[in-house]
Amino acid sequence: MVIKKGEIMNEIISLVSLSVIFGAMLSGFATFRLTGMRLMPHFASLMIAFILTLASLFISNNIIGYLAIAFQVITPLTVCPTICNILKTQFQNTGIYSAHLALMGMMFILALGNVILF
């Protein structure tokens, strides 16, 4: 079995993506508790992205890999409509959301890296 350089890099970036998604789940839980059910589609998408990314590390299947990347791209986009409305009306609470939004930005960039390397 020969391991190519691109395969190792793909696994590394997937592992980093997984850690960012896990951190986003933790910071997102606090955000989710504050905003209620308005962020449910985003939180569900985040959990699906976590499960698919974890599965793509253990199962060598292109469909699972591409689904993981797709959800890594979709998840940051699902937070935009809800969080923009919240930040307009509750700007004093922006510190609470900043960690989660930063992780969503990192996740989007890592997903683009996954697209290039996959």
Curated annotation (Swiss-Prot):
Membrane among the record's keywords? yes
Topology with respect to the bilayer: Multi-pass membrane protein
Q: Which residues cross the membrane?
A: 12-32, 39-59, 63-83, 98-118
| Coiled-coil parts of chain | none
Keyword line: Cell membrane, Membrane, Transmembrane, Transmembrane helix
GO cellular component terms listed in the entry, alphabetical order? plasma membrane
Its localization reads: Cell membrane
Pfam family, any one: DUF5400
Answer yes or no on keyword Cell membrane: yes
Indicate the principal place this protein occupies in or around the cell. membrane
Protein name, entry field: Uncharacterized protein MJ0759
Instruction: Report the source organism.
Output: Methanocaldococcus jannaschii (strain ATCC 43067 / DSM 2661 / JAL-1 / JCM 10045 / NBRC 100440)
